[in-house]
């Protein structure tokens, strides 16, 4: 079990309280699909992903980005049991969707870039430490069924 300090909890809660899920979710998923184009293979049913412009304009990608952020909200609300919170989602991604678990880390990295850009100087080293810890726990939980 991961132990969280009061400061870490406060930082992560603060980040989420200021997030526009639609904007941040869309930008993060789009960035992942553009920067790491091999991740597009999991989104074949989402239509044309031919170039950056079509990805950025794709409403299905935008909606899925928002869904991802709401999924992270579940981790925020269950910080003391993220592993079990994501057990079913991990199973779905491993057994049914066959998503390479490294892609969770790539998306987490893109999410960090987008949030850091949005927060600017408020994204301090202390903030990044807490945020990276949170995302590392989430990524580990999502990859749990692969081990």
Curated annotation (Swiss-Prot):
GO CC terms, sorted: blood microparticle; haptoglobin-hemoglobin complex; hemoglobin complex
InterPro entries from the UniProt entry: Globin, Globin-like_sf, Globin/Proto, Hemoglobin_b, Hemoglobin_oxygen_transport
Domain of life according to the entry: Eukaryota
Domain Globin: 3-147
Tissue localization of expression: Red blood cells.
Pfam families, per database record: Globin
Positions with a binding annotation for heme b: 64, 93
Protein keywords: Heme, Iron, Metal-binding, Oxygen transport, Transport
GO biological processes: hydrogen peroxide catabolic process
GO molecular function ontology, one term from the record: peroxidase activity
Family membership: Belongs to the globin family.
Miscellaneous notes: Hb 3 displays a Bohr effect, which is enhanced by organophosphates, and a Root effect, which is enhanced by ATP.
Subunit record text: Hb 3 is a heterotetramer of two alpha-2 and two beta-2 chains.
Free-text function comment from the UniProt entry: Involved in oxygen transport from gills to the various peripheral tissues.
Protein name: Hemoglobin subunit beta-2
Species assigned in the record: Boreogadus saida (Polar cod)
Name of the gene: hbb2
